[in-house]
Amino acid sequence: MAEASSWRNLLGTIISDPQERQRLANAIGVNPFTLTRWVTNQSLPRRESLLRLVKVCPPQYSALLSNLIAQEWEDFSLTDAAGDLQAAEAVPTEVYTDVLAIKATTPQNTHFWMISQRLVSAMLKQLDPHNVGVGISILACTKPAAGKSVRSLHVVGGDGTAPLKQKTSEAVAYLVGIESLAGYAVTVGRLLSLQHMEGDRLPFLKIAGIESAIACPVKREGRTAASLSVVSIQADYFLQTQLTLIESYANLVALAFTEEQFYEPERIRLSALPDQQRQRLSFSTFQQRVKQLMNVAVRNQHPLKVTEAEEQVWQQLEGELLDVPLSTEEESGTKVYP
């Protein structure tokens, strides 16, 4: 075999054997087609993925493959990448300690904000240590009227790394339903992974500007309170070990919610909603509506807490948006939600 000029050329030679391609894909935790996209430079692997590739490739190629990768990735180091990989595989002990301390020592009305902030920060540090571009959102079930079903989710927390940090912080007030990956994960009751949007078979779950997306329901005793959404601007970004990590974080996010915020599966019947752009006008008056409700409640001598007024406004807006006819594009399915 002539000496390969790049790690992509060498990998192309290795995976020319279909069985070896499948073996490598299984060992790395990616789709076999992902390896082909690496070879053709259609997709950029993470350092952690390259480390796994070097470790599991045929022994006769490992040294050359490592050297070729280092030529293209100047900051690539097997030692550093191994550290990144190990750090990304499990929730750190100190995160568990911090969350339990919040639950034990702080007022209940601060639990959601403090716990969600701690967990989102820890997730970003683990899932995107090199600031590639990852966004995280927590979308809670919108509280339904008595005896009614949950029809939508709404964003209650999140953050991101550039360039998704600004987008995540801006997209605070809007509703999603069954048309979103987050809503679909809640409906089916399990983690969903879309690792390459361009070739995916579920166009109605695509997200504008996003190449990889994960959504995991936040559950307790079989009931659901929210969906944890994690997205990246890179295709094939999330390894199998990181899907397990995201599930672990979703279990911890459940500690941020109160008992009454969880709903039995039969009470969750998500509907399709207009896209975020069409919702902006409605939500531009969100805070104004909250203040009006609180003022009326005070005049009626039945004052409301801010959270109670916000719940009522979410319900009002949900009802209004469910009555809005979907556009042709929305009915056919391309959405822009996390």
Identify the residue ranges that each predicted region occupies.
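A short, Lys/Arg-rich alpha-helix, primarily the initiator
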Residues: M1-R23, A27
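Signal-transducing coiled-coil/dimerization helices and immediately adjacent hinge/linker segments
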Residues: G83-A90, E260-P338
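Regulatory sensory and allosteric helical modules in signal-transduction proteins
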Residues: A140-R201
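Helix-to-coil/beta transition segments that act as allosteric "coupling" elements at the rims
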Residues: I178, T187, E198-A225
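Regulatory loop-to-helix N-cap segments in sensory/regulatory domains
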Residues: V231-I246, E264
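Allosteric cytosolic regulatory segments
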Residues: E247-A254
